[in-house]
């Protein structure tokens, strides 16, 4: 028998800055608790102000390092940050692997930062099916920015574009990411393209190829946002 949940008290505690209340609310979301509808209704009046940034890219391109760097930059501006790192599900428990949280441990004791790993649980799209509700929890809890790091990128893994206010696509030279991005339709969903590990050979060629492919796309009309392609080497940050 599930324990009864005092939803109004839990939401009020989360809005007051209690990380335990935020964790409890996200757990209710992930577990599909019977009180989930009541939770979402209670959060609704307090959500809608957070800016959501999605980070996606193939495994090994440096998503977690980039997320951590963005987190630090936003904290320097005094912003309250939430991070949802969607990990591949454990084949045994269905729970999230905690590698991302280990890499972000420098911010773990910051009261203005909330970091949560979420299991994809086999859901395609690079996200967990509960990610939208978890974003609403962090939004209502007062986060100014929510960073969402996806499992990866592929033909089916473009959900982040419909969920985030801005989507950052990370690529690396020498991994064939530019060609794969074109095949997967990622060029249509990215707001910013970052060629990470730009100290490697082939970075300039990757940037050039991406800019060329974007110029051939459908976002070249006047007034439309044309995604920039930038180089980044986080080893220097």
Q: What are these language model-derived features?
A:
Residues 60:
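Walker A (P-loop) phosphate-binding loop of P-loop NTPases
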Residues 235-237:
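Conserved small/polar residues in nucleotide/adenosyl-binding loops
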